Amino acid sequence: TRSAFPTEAKRHAAISQVRGQEMVDVFITLHDSQNTCRITALGGVIGARFTGLVTAQVPVAKLQAIAALDEVEQVSIAEMMESNVDTTRSVTSVNYVAEGLQHGLPANYDGKGVVFGIIDSGIDFNHAAFQDSLGNTRIKCVYMPADNSGTKVTIDGTVLPGSEFDSTRIASLTTDLASSAHGSHTAFIGAGSHCGQYSGMAPGADIVMCALGGKKNDVNIANSLKYITQYAKRVGKPCVISISLGTKQGPHDGTSKLCKIYEEMGKSDAVICLSAGNLGSYRRYIHHKFSGMNTATNPNIGSYVTGTQAGYTANFAIDTWSRSRSAVGIKYLLIDPDDNSIFYETGIMKAYTYHYIGPGMESKRGYNAFLSQYFSGKIGVWVTTESNGHIETYSEVSLKPLRSDVKAYKMAVQFYGADGVEFDSWVTSENAYSWHPQVGDYKFVNGSDSCSMNDNVTGKNTISVGNYVGRNRYMSLSGKEMYNSIYPEGSIYVQSSYGIAPNGESYPFVAAPGYFVVSAYNGY
């Protein structure tokens, strides 16, 4: 189960202190989603309930005990998400439908009578973009899972983490995350009011905001989905939810926890629109099928991980999924930049492995004495069988040189698997898979962007959205016209994520303007 992962893995949500106890956000897959008594007896706090699973906060010290309960199928620690996103209205014909009566349509379709839900962070709650012409807020309510200063939220008899703020308290709010403007930007595009010549797509909609702040993880997205859909049911209005958050890691076949929740909620509760991502043109993906048994000296695929010169600090993660119940092993190489020789190589790692590296780590099991002469950091590998029956090999690497004279060793990875085993692998940090000259028996291939979309879009009952160039010029705040002739108007933007997933589906389903879009900014 995912609970076997050490909580220090960077893919996972940070540990929180709740009444002096270390707690972590999780999904718990259950044989009976109502049978949670023993989980709460062990200190777990149940959040939103979905078919076959619940969200929860559980004590770190009780993770293994909860995972061992008979009624529990799997415990999955929350995983961090990443942010993905005038002329835009005209090129998408939004102006036409917003003024529908003038064009023979039965109504003006500007979002009136619809709940527009946004799940994001970096929201300026009192921006003019979210007010009507009289200066009154259009935000009906705000839910913040990381803020307990509002009113507690109870749904289906359980209390969600964090709190809510109704429209009478919006004026007292500032922002959930001053270091980001992403949520202000995406919310204005979706439902912003008329601000001069600019407007969002649905300026007549009722706005419900779920502001994640620094807790931008999949569990809090699930809690926010439940919050928005329950509000829409309560007021008796249809609901559209926009989410421009996602993750590069995951099976990309619609079976991850958040995909299944989207599938459930998208059946009848809401129209859910998801950003495909902004990783088109980045070579972060490898797909391969092994032919012939591999040995330690004769792998048949590998790649150089760009931007990972260990002498200048290497920090990246690799997420590899076998398409079967046969694990894919990995080996890391440090290549000398002067003569392309192998400076160091790990063994083949096909089970949980953890290298503790650096001064002060001598007492740790897994202490790597050789690398500790040069670096501090870690190499971690976790191998788990997931809910789709396939085996995930996830790895994190962090190497920081101890001295200025440590060479900038290049890092590469080699993959190992049995004959016929097929796998997909993504390098999940700001790196890429790249060709490199052969080193000994080790060969290296380029990665591609052919499966670059966010894992969350691969489920059912959602609309995946890519982006195209709606405009290639805009007026800067200083009054200077900015123009980029490289990207023609109407063309798919080069960084728009796309691909054919392992489940055979092509993504995204639609595209919207996503380059040089004028939108709101966080004033904080």
Located regions from the model:
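Mobile, glycine-rich extracellular loop/lid and propeptide segments
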Residues: 39-40, 50-69, 188-191, 199-203, ...
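Short acidic, glycine-rich surface-loop motifs adjacent to enzyme active sites
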Residues: 211, 228-253, 275-276, 412-420
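Autoinhibitory N-terminal propeptides
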Residues: 1-106, 115, 128, 303
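Extracellular S/T/G-rich loop segment that most often corresponds to the catalytic His/Ser-adjacent loop
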Residues: 143-162, 267, 283-392, 445-446, ...
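Subtilisin-like serine protease catalytic core
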Residues: 101-220, 236-237, 269-271, 283-284, ...
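Active-site core segment of subtilase-fold serine proteases
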Residues: 107, 123-184, 200, 338-434, ...
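Hydrophobic beta-strand segments within beta-rich accessory/binding domains
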Residues: 25, 300-331, 401, 409-431
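Catalytic-core regions built around general acid/base machinery
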Residues: 257-269
